[in-house]
Amino acid sequence: MKYVNHKTIVAFLPEIGKAGSHVTSRPNLEARVDRDSHGATKLFLSSICRVMAAKETQAERGLISSCFNLALGWQLSNAMSDDTCANPLLLGWIKEWLDQARERNTKGVTVYKKAYESMKACPLTFQHPSEAQQLNGLGPKLCERLTNKLKEYCKEHGLPMPEDPRTAKADKRKSTDGDTEGQPAKKARKPKPYAPALRSGPFALILALSSLDENSNQSMTKAELIEKAQPYCDSSFTVPSDPTKFFTAWNSMKILLTKELVYTRGHPLKKYSLTEEGWEVAKAIKKTAQKSIQNTLPFDVQSDVTADEPRTAQREDLASQRDFERQIRPGLQAHNSQRHTLDSLENTLDNSTITPIPISPDNFTVQLILDTREVRTSKDRDYISNELIRKGITPEVRALEVGDTMWVAKFHDPTFLRKYGEEGDEIMLDWIVERKRLDDLIGSIKDGRFHEQKFRLRRSGIKNVIYLIEEFAVTHHESNAAAAQKYHDMVASAIAQTQVVNGYFVKRTKNLDDTIRYLARMTFLLRNMYSAPSPPSSRTSARPSHTLALLPTRHLALSSSHISALNTLRAENPHVTYGVTFPTFCAIASKSDALTLRDIFLKMLMCTKGVSGDKALEIQRVWPTPQAFIRAFEELTDPKQKENMVADRMAHVMVGRKKIAKVLSRKIAEVWGGLPG
């Protein structure tokens, strides 16, 4: 019989002998077997009782004799093997715990067996159980349990408790050091218990395994474990966060196995379970996680998130929430004091040349739009969309004229805008994201796309531009350290320029998964901003914090500059979002369609290296058209005058770092004035 406790059988030997010779003693033996034995040992002793109740006297005597010999043999062999150990007392207690674990068929069998074998093979005699930590399989917790057992043993037998050698050495140092008299002895530094980072791979795996019953023998396969753990982890267990790497969150399982928090069994299909130390870590994580969840701010996503989706997809940390509020809620405090309503919107704009059309929040929902070129790799084009769907956001994927991600107000009724003479069923919101991976950002700076994209973003009229920079490992050879530093300075300068000069919000993310989480949080927040509270409060108005108004396309066609009109309207009503229909926005932001002569001239000027958007604008103000610019050069006959024409003319307009230097002026003259290079 497997996992039979030998000591329990030895304890039953006298009563087994009595029951063999006296029939009246058998009921007492059966009652004690039922009360004092467990598991395989109980099954073994019960079978003896049943055989002794049989009528074959010869078989009964033979079985009892065999049991005596078997039990005595176990006792002698164990005693001999334990006596050869340098620490028989400690070994005996570990053996006792190992037998108990085998009887109950618990997960501690593996731990105690490893500790038993290490202690048995150790030739060193330990003065204190704490010294056993140097053995493989004996950690601080098991040594602490041995120490408590030794204290009980010494108290029971009237023996002095051995002193911990580490404490004794500290006391000795204190007594021999006369200069340090009066100073408290330094406490021995206890090893810190393992604490995985929040929403990391080990964190998710431990939480998933803790969903099993601690007192059962249950376990999980890899597929089951990944399915359970994924909602608790920010990284994917199946797809690497970096396309150039092969590591996923599943690689953290090796850490848990090394630290003996998880053990495996079964071959070839491995199954995973928590050890006793693993269960302690899991309980500590759950206590910490409960406090963390109480500090989170849930978003209202009832219309998009199904009931069986994890709650973690709807919760976001407080730090990220503050980051968003600092970015996109600058006008909320002023709005709370004024309480503007949709009814007063038309009255405030009666004297304006453009009359916006107020839109009720009940007519639309906020929809996330992704560019078709936003993919993880060429072979995994749907990764971003699928991950957003898992987080409760269903994006629409289409080709965008500008930006990589934007948000629109999508009407429930597709024909809603027709009564105002507009096409489509979507109005642009004032939020757009330009996503740049770090290597792509460096490339766009080098080839000029960086400035051209920012120029089109400004011309689109979108107020809140988010420049999202995704970290990426850009490797350089050791011999090319100077180039690496150059790229680092280039990126830092571009980020500073984007924030200070262009006034865009720069968001840096660690990887693609972090970017996806950011887009999901932004979508939830915008939905809260543009939707009325539900249920409405009886004391406060049930109006959203931001309202939406449509700028008719016909007014934009008559307006000399829709951007200046937008700026005027936004200054008068900062809490109102003024948007155009999506088709109109695409026409305005198109790279080639509906370009004015001014726009073409600006793009032509920016083709010269060193001419930024601001410098091109100032040049265009002095010489409105390409023809005027060329004629200005033709009127000058002296090559030196042509070379310095732009620099001299712009000297009083642009100062400081924005000033056009003589070198740049010569470059412009070579292109536009026919000056030989």
UniProtKB/Swiss-Prot annotation:
Gene Ontology BP annotations: DNA catabolic process; double-strand break repair via break-induced replication; mitotic intra-S DNA damage checkpoint signaling; resolution of meiotic recombination intermediates
EC number: 3.1.22.-
Lineage top rank: taxon: Eukaryota
Compositionally biased region (Basic and acidic residues): 156-177
Listed cofactors: Mg(2+)
Pfam families to which the protein is assigned, alphabetical: ERCC4, MUS81-like_WH
One Gene Ontology term, aspect cellular component: Holliday junction resolvase complex
Broad EC category: hydrolase
Chief place where the protein resides: nucleus
GO molecular function, one term: crossover junction DNA endonuclease activity
Domain ERCC4 span(s) in chain numbering: 367-473
Cellular compartments annotated: Nucleus
Residue span of region Disordered: 156-196
Record keywords, A-Z: DNA damage, DNA recombination, DNA repair, Endonuclease, Hydrolase, Magnesium, Meiosis, Metal-binding, Nuclease, Nucleus
Described purpose of this protein according to its UniProt entry: Interacts with eme1 to form a DNA structure-specific endonuclease with substrate preference for branched DNA structures with a 5'-end at the branch nick. Typical substrates include 3'-flap structures, D-loops, replication forks and nicked Holliday junctions. May be required in mitosis for the processing of stalled or collapsed replication fork intermediates. May be required in meiosis for the repair of meiosis-specific double strand breaks subsequent to single-end invasion (SEI).
Subunit architecture: Interacts with eme1.
Recorded family membership: Belongs to the XPF family.
PANTHER family listed in its UniProt record: CLASS II CROSSOVER JUNCTION ENDONUCLEASE MUS81, CROSSOVER JUNCTION ENDONUCLEASE MUS81
Protein's name according to its UniProt entry: Crossover junction endonuclease mus81
Source organism: Emericella nidulans (strain FGSC A4 / ATCC 38163 / CBS 112.46 / NRRL 194 / M139)
